[in-house]
Amino acid sequence: MEDGAPYGASVRESLVHVLDTARELGFRTENMDGHLGWCEYGEGDEMVAVLGHLDVVPAGDGWSCDPFGGELRGGKIWGRGATDDKGPAIASLFALAALRDSGLPIRRRIRILFGCNEEAGSDDIKYYLANGGEIPVMGFTPDGEYPVINGEKGIINVTFSHANVQTGDVRLLSIHGGTAPNVVPAHACAKLACPRELAQRLANL
């Protein structure tokens, strides 16, 4: 593991870029050892959090453009994470700048959290809390839909195993599919040992 890059160099690069942008916009920032970063605007004892994240699920195959190129087509940005969650996170940053520039008075600080491990279990938030990260009085994620979604209730990753006891003419040699636990597999592959006639029938399905 690289220093300051607990979730990989590319995620660290995204975090450094967004925090640099936030500083250029005039916001206070903090980088929590590459696990998570935040920027903040306003004064007051209480804080409202906007929880975004910069990591993405694996890009997979079948793209007609560079999945990390941010290509603009028809007024839309195409790329992995454009809607979940880089686009909403950056939109929140510029919305915060617009709010500040409007001069509208606010009673609480607004902090945008830029997570780096949401897609793989949210260890970034655990690190934030374990290292003195302030708990907000309220918060929301910017990538939801209407009507309001009242929180995800959790995730369970399960590993199954079974003794390789097989009889008959068909034997399963291997099976695999998918790139991450929270991604619908684009394809799956099974390797079978079976009589040639059956293999031909399967090939003709």
PLM segments and residue spans:
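Generic non-transmembrane alpha-helical segments
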Residues: 17-25, 98, 201-205
